[in-house]
Amino acid sequence: MRTDNRTAGQLRPVQITTGCLMTAEGSALIKVGNTHVLCAATIEDTVPPFLRNTGKGWVTAEYSMLPRATAKRTPREVTKGRPSGRTHEIQRLIGRSMRSAVDMSSFGERTLIIDCDVIQADGGTRTASITGAFVAMALAFRQLIEYRALKANPIRDYVAATSVGLVGGIPMLDLCYEEDSQADVDMNVVMTGGGKFVEVQATAEHSAFDDAQMAELTELARTGIAQLVRMQKEIIEG
């Protein structure tokens, strides 16, 4: 039994609330256990210079954490003058994950920006951000269709993410902060609704792992992501 009384293959309680921001084209507040992330999607009628006059759009993301999202206050990165390497890595991961699910040639020269702001952190902030960001993005594209600015939905597939790890030699799904800090191996997995991998980030923190352990962890992640995609579908498709 784990610190929060879950079984090894059990997700934390997940709740996704939409329409949290009346000013955003799409928004979702995702709660994965005690990790809470507010995701907001904005659509702008412009694209980066490398896409001008191509007829293609772009999807990108920004990620940040409130100072008291963590047990000890973390200073705002704006006071340091630039985002940290960790922040750059996470927001690029979110952007790549969203682009994997979208046909960039089907929504014109527009940019969809997803802001992911961590309100409370207890492990898995990047994976929660990806799962919530997809919902916000889907709602933003739906609004374009309702306003007749788009004829077809640019989304090709769903995308969601979760963490897995080896804690005390036991494969576990959806690690909280305490488990993550004790893990021998931790892994973040992003997959499509069709079961294809978008990204796998795996690190041996205290001991190396073999092919069989990696396969076991990715399959465990697959079961969790399938549950998350079902939740997304219930929200988006009603």
UniProtKB/Swiss-Prot annotation:
Domain of life: Bacteria
EC number(s) reported in the record: 2.7.7.56
Keyword Lipid biosynthesis belongs to the record: no
Family annotation (PROSITE patterns): RIBONUCLEASE_PH
Gene Ontology terms: biological process: rRNA catabolic process; rRNA processing; tRNA processing
Residue positions binding phosphate: R86, G124, T125, R126
Catalytic activity: tRNA(n+1) + phosphate = tRNA(n) + a ribonucleoside 5'-diphosphate
GO MF term list: 3'-5'-RNA exonuclease activity; tRNA binding; tRNA nucleotidyltransferase activity
Keywords: Nucleotidyltransferase, RNA-binding, rRNA processing, Transferase, tRNA processing, tRNA-binding
Signal peptide: none
A Pfam cross-reference name: RNase_PH_C
Family (UniProt): Belongs to the RNase PH family.
Annotated protein name in UniProt: Ribonuclease PH
Organism from which the protein derives: Solibacter usitatus (strain Ellin6076)
Taxonomic lineage: Bacteria, Pseudomonadati, Acidobacteriota, Terriglobia, Bryobacterales
